[in-house]
Swiss-Prot record:
Organism in which the protein naturally occurs: Pediococcus pentosaceus (strain ATCC 25745 / CCUG 21536 / LMG 10740 / 183-1w)
Annotated positions binding DNA: 313, 318
Protein's UniProt name: Holliday junction branch migration complex subunit RuvB
Region annotation Head domain (RuvB-H): where it falls in the sequence: 258-337
Region (Small ATPAse domain (RuvB-S)): 185-255
E.C. number: 3.6.4.-
Amino acid sequence: MEDERITSAEVQSPDEENEELSLRPQTLHQYIGQDQIKHELEVYIAAAKNREEALDHVLLYGPPGLGKTTLAMVIANEMNVQIRTTSGPAIEKPGDLVALLNELQPGDVLFIDEIHRLPKVVEEMLYSAMEDFFVDIVVGQGPTAHPIHFPLPPFTLIGATTRAGLLSAPLRDRFGIVEHMNYYNEADLANIVRRSAGIFNSHIDDQGAYEIASRSRGTPRISNRLLKRIRDFAEVENDGQIDRQLVSQSLKLLQVDNRGLDRTDKKVLTTMIELYGGGPVGISTIAANIGEEPDTISEMYEPYLLQIGFLKRTPRGRMVTERAYEHLGLIDQYMNK
């Protein structure tokens, strides 16, 4: 398997992460899509500011690449407070958490990405920090060990996760605001593409923007990555102009089809069809046949194929749908099953 997929929803390099910073909106007004979530947050933020209180703790969950980190930064900006960012795996022990909490001023935001990966001992320390704004620290060892009560300023914890089901109930219940971020529609993605093109000083027409949007798997991060690659083709081959024809030609070379499938997605589907008659077949079996880990299949490939109706889950395993056979030009095989 290739190390990097142009249609992956994950950040693929530090350079890409830095470039995302330049594309991020600063306010809810600038933030495109997720309209229901934005409306709710506008109300919660306005109410908290009117009461001069910290915003309630926020949990953002959903697939990768949908803007959870961006939204956390927008929330902090709208609240006119500082944000400290970290991730679950980076907080290895209680002392790491205490150091982060100690930096917070009243009302500040602590953002923890991949919060489902917090060590259990750290998670348990968060309970009192979130609920009552204090932590108890044990200092010393053996008979001399004793707790120290450490008060904290009121703050907002924003947790982000792609796997909300892995959060423990006690942690999940301490979030007053819980928002599920959904895949984006093509109109919103096209607006994101146009906005990013403007920041890149690239010229793109509406049809070009919609063509990129239609192949972006409902994910802004993928839209921006495709735009970057297509911009290269435009500058070299089309006087910097991005139109529908250039987008189609460029993505054909990059092996991204009109539904956003790349060669790995197609390999998953064709392996199931050619070796197992379209299924049902288990994730572990699919993974073994294409040289991937089962978790990689279930987290990176399966969600989008399920979303667009190319796969379905059954009690006996995954099955390729008629829609997928038709897309792959194999409808005769489906009819002859």
